[in-house]
From Swiss-Prot:
Involved in the regulation of glutamine synthetase GlnA, a key enzyme in the process to assimilate ammonia. When cellular nitrogen levels are high, the C-terminal adenylyl transferase (AT) inactivates GlnA by covalent transfer of an adenylyl group from ATP to specific tyrosine residue of GlnA, thus reducing its activity. Conversely, when nitrogen levels are low, the N-terminal adenylyl removase (AR) activates GlnA by removing the adenylyl group by phosphorolysis, increasing its activity. The keyword ATP-binding applies. PANTHER family: BIFUNCTIONAL GLUTAMINE SYNTHETASE ADENYLYLTRANSFERASE_ADENYLYL-REMOVING ENZYME (PTHR30621:SF0), GLUTAMINE SYNTHETASE ADENYLYLTRANSFERASE (PTHR30621). It comes from Mycobacterium leprae (strain TN). Residues 502-1004 are annotated as: Adenylyl transferase. It catalyses: [glutamine synthetase]-O(4)-(5'-adenylyl)-L-tyrosine + phosphate = [glutamine synthetase]-L-tyrosine + ADP; [glutamine synthetase]-L-tyrosine + ATP = [glutamine synthetase]-O(4)-(5'-adenylyl)-L-tyrosine + diphosphate. This is Bifunctional glutamine synthetase adenylyltransferase/adenylyl-removing enzyme. Keywords: ATP-binding, Magnesium, Multifunctional enzyme, Nucleotide-binding, Nucleotidyltransferase, Transferase. Residues 1-497 are annotated as: Adenylyl removase. Pfam families: GlnD_UR_UTase, GlnE. Gene3D superfamilies: Beta Polymerase, domain 2, Nucleotidyltransferases domain 2. Belongs to the GlnE family. One of its GO terms (molecular function) is [glutamine synthetase]-adenylyl-L-tyrosine phosphorylase activity. GO terms for biological process: regulation of glutamine family amino acid metabolic process.
Length: 1004
């Protein structure tokens, strides 16, 4: 029959409602039609059945509804006729039941296991009050323990069923609007109801635990402090419930009751976690109020005070719980005065970002960029910073805290409203994902899983909008909400600061006081908060468009800069750069319209002194901070192409000074490009060294060409050919930012020209080149060092090829032969340069190898260098050049092996340390493991040495001690975090191991 106890008069065929097809109902199960017929829902065309079918089609997953309905039909305990009749006539029941079955497989299984629970969803259903919840749970265990034969766990199944029934009712009311025209429950109401259910459940768990442990004895006084989302009454459907126990006496009996309570609750309801207690899982489970006070006064970290923001006395002895809160909450609001508060907050901010594995970062609702943790962490931090002086911020829930921050002027009211809306949307999705299987999760479906995305959209009551289907609308909404949270996250911290110092046109009309602004800046990592405020004030109070644009930009820029190792230095550099480029309209427009450029620039400014100084005079490099079609624009310029452009540009000038100025200009731009790419992790250290060598070589060539042009009248022929031989790291193409250029000059008289005349002219040219390049300027210095030439400073600056050959054959010391190992022709006459190298080969790679006496002399010299050349006061463990396992150790070791074996192994005829190490490994001269030790030490020391120049802006070889500067060096060297101590430990470990092998080669 069509409807129970209802006489149905069939309409004529022309008046019957059209029964929708299985496909139109959104049913994809191949047995769907069969199951509909089994239930009797597909046999009639009357309005009741058609309405029921359309209700089914609106469920988030109609197939997921149908499967448990068939199981209920088949279960005699269901009372199918009663249920079916109710579904046909009770639209509210239909909406609630179909919505919950289409959204939660787990609650569907619960309903099948307890088929009479469907009756909880019919009629006028409302959420039970806190009192009703406590009564229901109390009644469930009212007679527990009356019978001495009761097993301790006999009550658990009843409690589990009751708890799931409460979730069923709440979820059904929460979801009903997805199927029928039912009221939408606000997120805050759902989260608070979940917390109320947890309160009642935990109170019952405590009662059961007391009965199991104490029997008829008086139980100990025990308070259960709710923490986390439970404490804030913003609980998820599936959460670990965080607790702290406080006892009148922290004795074994109290501990047993607490342990038993956790066990009962975990088995009947949800996972209970006491990990937020003092000392975490290693600490005592139960403490007295006095013990808690002592711990928080002496040992607690900032994150532990942050966790207490959510503390609430929820279960057990109320007086004891309130005493605990009264004692500890004043410490929470004073936490920002602690000496290590800023450092710990910075560490927490970075830890939040590092928690998410890269492969799921885009799917993370909680920990991803623009996710829930961004909101929660920001809100809690602002509460900690300002709650000391403003009791209106002493609230536990995130939504209430956002409202209080808006009312107090700590964030804009509109921003607070927008952030609340985004937060509630993301929490709604989190709830829907957890409901599906009653599992703790905050991972969105994989983007390619269209079915899962569509289900989530429908469960979240998202419908097609004409341009996209429900899944497409969800994707767009997620993107928009994440973006809004990311943008507001920065604005949250910094916009009110601008109001406290900026013009009245800014959006917040009642910004925080200057004292509060300084306090907040200090918390965010700005050590000189007063000075920082002055810089910010100077930027936003500029007249006209510039000040307005800075007011818009600064919240985001300051936030990004706060993650850099030196925010104070970065802010000063940003102010100087902005003032220097005040006439350039593209500058602020680029930062406004291209967030990737702005973010990278803030990192560079907050890490380096060297690069910002270059950007002042080569600002066009900033425009290369973005990405092109082929990747980062900073990598588009090839070093060889830059070198050719530099030589060509300098060649346009007849005046050597102007030519050198042109060369400096292009070098400046190239140094800014390479330094920026290095700081942003876009270049390997070997690529950096080659690029720096390339530009140095180009400058040498440009300078030599310019001076020769100036000293040759038009049409005259040069009296000599000149070649520049690169030595040291220049010859090995391994220059760093602070390296000078070790060179030697060689000449060859032109036909018919006397040696004396050629040498006089060549010496004048070489001296002029060196003097021009050494001329002081605002750019990094161009120091040319020719002291490796024969006889050093006492010898002539230029020699003929024959004179070099004679000197090396007759007078050269072992160290001079060693220096030739890195000789390479870099500029000037290429043919002459190659002939010099052929001559040098006979000296550095003699047919029978170097003598044993020469090897002993080199070892003695190495010992003398270690004893005498290390600067006074330098730490030998952390001196990157001359320290233990530093650059000199590795290079001398490699060169000694070249001297001993290169006559037999042409592969060792290399000027590069790294290439020589590769050849040593290939020839099996030493074990590969030892080669790797040397290689890693050289790379580590080179990165550190380069980073020192980038950070300090001047040449230095000594790593600083622990502190902000060491942190900056770590970041500049490519260390994965800004923990300078970790970086230093790694440096010491790598260089110590390398030094062990170096001692084997040279002797201790």
């Amino acid at each position: 029959m069509c409807c129970t106890t209802v006489v149905v008069v069939r309409k004529p065929a022309t008046e019957r409602l059209k029964r929708p097809s299985v496909g139109r109902l959104g049913l994809f199960d191949p047995h769907a039609a069969e199951n509909l017929a089994l239930l009797g829902w597909y046999d009639y065309d009357c309005r009741e059945h058609v309405d029921l079918l359309w209700s089914l089609s609106r469920a988030p997953d109609a197939d997921a509804v149908l499967r448990p309905m068939v199981r209920l039909f088949e279960n005699p305990a269901t009372g199918w006729d009663e249920l079916n009749a109710a579904l046909l006539t009770d639209r509210g029941l239909r909406g609630r039941l179909f919505a919950v079955l289409g959204s939660s497989l787990a609650l569907g299984d619960h309903l099948v296991a307890h088929p009479q629970s469907w009756k909880l969803l019919r009629g006028r259903v409302s959420l039970p009050s806190r009192t009703q919840l406590h009564q229901a749970f109390d009644e469930c265990v009212s007679n527990f323990g009356d019978d001495p034969l009761d097993a301790p766990d006999s009550v658990l199944p009843r409690l589990r069923t009751l708890y799931c029934d409460q979730l069923l009712v709440l979820a059904a009311l929460d979801l009903a609007a997805t199927v029928e025209d039912e009221p939408v429950l606000p997120f805050t109401l759902v989260a608070a109801q979940l917390a109320d259910i947890a309160d009642a459940a935990m109170a019952t768990a405590l009662r059961v635990a007391e009965k199991i442990v104490c029997g008829d004895r008086t139980p100990p006084r025990l308070a259960v402090i709710a923490m986390g989302k439970w404490g804030a009454r913003e609980l998820n459907y599936v959460s670990d419930v965080d607790i702290i126990f406080v006892a009148e006496q922290a004795d074994p009996l109290s501990t047993r009751v607490a342990s038993e309570m956790m066990r009962v609750a975990s088995e009947a309801f949800f996972q209970v976690d006491a990990g937020l207690r003092p000392e975490g899982r290693n600490g005592e489970l139960v403490r007295t109020v006095e013990s808690h006070i002592a711990y928080y006064q002496r040992w607690a970290k900032t994150w532990e005070f942050q966790a207490l923001l959510k503390a609430r006395s929820a279960v057990g002895d109320a007086e004891l719980g309130e005493r605990y809160l009264a004692a500890l909450m004043p410490m929470v609001w004073a936490a920002c005065e602690r000496a290590d508060f800023v450092a710990e907050v910075q560490a927490m901010r970075r830890r939040v970002e590092q928690l998410v594995p890269a492969d799921v970062r885009g799917r993370e609702l909680k920990l991803g960029s623009g996710g829930l943790r961004d909101v929660e962490f920001a809100v809690q931090l602002l509460q900690l910073v300002h709650g000391r002086s403003d009791e209106s911020l002493h609230v536990v829930s995130t939504v209430d805290a956002l409202a209080a921050l808006g009312e107090g002027g700590y964030i804009g009211r509109e921003d607070a409203a927008n952030l609340t809306a985004s937060y509630e949307f993301l929490r709604l999705l989190e709830h829907r994902l957890q409901l599906q299987r009653l599992k703790r999760t905050h991972l969105l479906p994989e983007d390619g899983d269209e079915e899962a995305v569509r289900w989530l959209a429908r469960a979240a009551h998202i419908r097609p909008d004409g341009r996209h289907d429900a899944a497409g609308v969800l994707r767009e909404e997620l993107k928009n909400q994440n973006l809004r949270v990311s943008q507001l996250h920065a604005k949250l911290f910094y916009q009110p600061l601008l109001e406290s110092i900026g013009p009245a046109s800014l959006e917040i009309r009642h910004g925080m006081t200057s004292e509060a602004a300084e306090r907040q800046l200090a918390t965010l990592g700005y050590e000189g908060s007063q000075t920082a405020l002055k810089h910010i004030s100077a930027l936003v109070n500029q007249s006209g468009r510039r000040g307005r644009v800075q007011s818009v930009l600064l919240p985001r820029l300051l936030n990004w800069m706060s993650y850099a190792p030196d925010p104070d230095g970065g802010l000063l550099a940003y102010r100087r750069l902005s003032e220097a480029l005040s006439a350039e309209t593209w500058y602020l427009s680029t930062l406004r319209d291209k967030p990737a450029v702005a973010r990278r620039l803030m990192h560079v400014l907050g890490t380096s002194v060297y690069v910002p100084d270059l950007l002042m005079r080569a600002p066009e490099v900033i425009q290369s901070y973005g990405d092109g079609l082929a990747g980062p624009k900073l990598l588009e310029a090839e070093p060889a192409m830059v070198a050719r452009a530099l030589i060509t540009s300098a060649g346009r000038h007849t005046d050597p000074i102007r030519a050198i100025d042109a060369a400096r200009s292009l070098r400046r731009r190239e140094l800014a490009r390479v330094g920026s790419a290095d700081l942003l992790g876009l270049l390997e250290v070997t690529e950096v060294c080659k690029a720096l060598t390339s530009v140095w070589v180009a400058v040498l060539q440009a300078a030599l060409d310019a001076v020769i042009r100036a000293y040759l009248p038009d049409g005259d022929k040069a009296p000599a050919a000149i070649a520049v031989i690169g030595m040291g790291r220049l010859g090995g193409a391994e220059l760093g930012y602070g390296s000078d250029a070790d060179v030697m000059f060689v000449c060859e008289p032109a036909i018919g020209v006397e040696d004396a005349q050629a040498l006089r002219w060549s010496g004048m040219i070489a001296e002029r080149v060196c003097r021009l390049l050494r001329t002081p300027s605002v750019d990094p210095p161009l120091d040319v060092d020719a002291n490796l030439r024969p006889e050093g400073r006492n010898g002539p600056l230029v020699r003929t090829l024959g004179a070099y050959a004679a000197y090396y054959a007759q007078w050269a010391q072992p160290w001079e032969i060693q220096a030739l190992l890195r000789a390479h022709a870099v500029a000037g006459d290429a043919d002459l340069g190659q002939r010099f190298l052929l001559m040098a080969d006979k000296m550095r790679y003699p047919p029978d190898g170097v003598s044993a006496e020469a090897v002993r002399e080199i070892r003695r010299m190495k010992a003398r260098v270690e004893a005498e050349r290390l600067p006074r006061g330098a730490d030998p463990h952390t001196h990157t050049k001359l320290g233990r396992g530093g650059l000199a150790d590795i290079e001398w070791t490699v060169q000694l092996m070249q001297l001993r074996h290169a006559h037999e192994l042409p592969a060792l005829h290399k000027t590069s340390t790294l290439e020589s190490l590769d050849a040593i490994a290939a020839a099996n001269l030493i074990p590969e493991a030892d080669v790797d030790l040397l290689r890693q030490a050289w790379l580590t020391a080179t990165r550190a040495r380069n980073a020192l120049v980038l950070v300090r802006g001047k040449t230095t070889d000594q790593l600083p001690g622990p502190g902000r500067q060491l942190n900056a060096v770590a970041v500049a060297a490519g260390w994965p975090s800004d923990d300078g101590s970790e970086f230093l430990d790694n440096y010491l470990r790598v260089t110590r191991r390398a030094k062990t092998f170096v001692r084997k080669v040279f002797g201790s």
